[in-house]
Amino acid sequence: MLKMNLANLQLFAHKKGGGSTSNGRDSQAKRLGAKAADGQTVTGGSILYRQRGTHIHAGVNVGRGGDDTLFAKVEGVVRFERKGRDKKQVSVYPIAK
């Protein structure tokens, strides 16, 4: 009768498991900010400033879209101005012909 000793063989990982993470993604940039410079000539309907909220207010001949984007209502020259002590506004002044 043969008696065999069976070895107690245990295998362990030689590298840590990869695991998972809840990070690793980012939202796309929204390209907010000034789209026309002070003194620049623009046509009617041109976007002047893209923003979230009213960082800059609409002035003369400037409209505000549903997402607070400021756009020119007429063709003219863009002017970024102060509105009171602590606010800013953008206006478009028509070019005299």
From Swiss-Prot:
GO terms for cellular component: cytosolic large ribosomal subunit. One of its GO terms (molecular function) is structural constituent of ribosome. Keywords: Ribonucleoprotein, Ribosomal protein. The keyword Ribosomal protein applies. InterPro entries: Ribosomal_bL27 (IPR001684), Ribosomal_bL27_CS (IPR018261). It holds the Pfam family Ribosomal_L27. Residues 14-36 are annotated as: Disordered. One of its GO terms (biological process) is translation. Belongs to the bacterial ribosomal protein bL27 family. PANTHER family: LARGE RIBOSOMAL SUBUNIT PROTEIN BL27M (PTHR15893:SF0), RIBOSOMAL PROTEIN L27 (PTHR15893). This is Large ribosomal subunit protein bL27. It comes from Streptococcus sanguinis (strain SK36). The lineage of its organism: Bacteria, Bacillati, Bacillota, Bacilli, Lactobacillales.
